[in-house]
């Protein structure tokens, strides 16, 4: 009897060792560079190591974790177990109703107020406005448990205190009243419905007449799965349609760092990449200029990626738009204002998270010593 148990035990041990060996071989033989589900580059096999710093173990562990066979299925199973057992907040992003939302922004009202006051100081005598969208989680609080709702209520309180100040264009009521979603279900950015509402709110505050839909050519790209879905680790059970509005009037689009000039603002070839949102304005650029010879006025936009889908709309109302993303711009806010010449207006367009937590924004607002 003992001999039979011993044989069975050995078979089990050998079987486990064989599986581990095969898994290790597969990890090296069939390694991948990129995960389409997680939308990130995977670790590469370690080539060099030093006995002085002993990094091989960590590098090898990271590599095997990324390259293990069936990794995406295992990650998806683990994420679903987190949701089914009431631990969804352990995920990097949180399932809520039919959407995936970002966790609430950690923001301090005084810090935000000081930061926007410095932005006004940079603008000087030039009229400036602020456009800060509410978060998707803030709009979906009623779909959450009481515990999760409480942390978004704190976020909403900070947002209300910030956007109630002078120069802020209100968006919350219009977004909350919309019968259609204003954010993508799988991404943290606003969708075209949200962009249009923001455009109309800006025009109402700044004065220009909003351009009609006939001024643009609408193109849809489907399916679109955003980075918020990818970071949840959940299978792509939901998908969005990416909607782009290309001006039907003549425009030029110049990227400063490359010197390249285009006659369009959307880039269809980007729609099928790992970050389909780069279809707007060809992704992230430090400084770009959009010109419309049929319009007048100069607008300077300090922005994050939320502005990428709004600028095509704004191009109908301004002869020249200079857009600066300080994350990719070498200079400060003051440097960008000087480089832009003499704009008639300034728009600061940032998500609440960028405004509160982006270190580039904080650092490049500082006064020079």
Walk through the language-model features, giving the residues of each.
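Extracellular glycan-modifying ectodomains
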Residues: 1-369
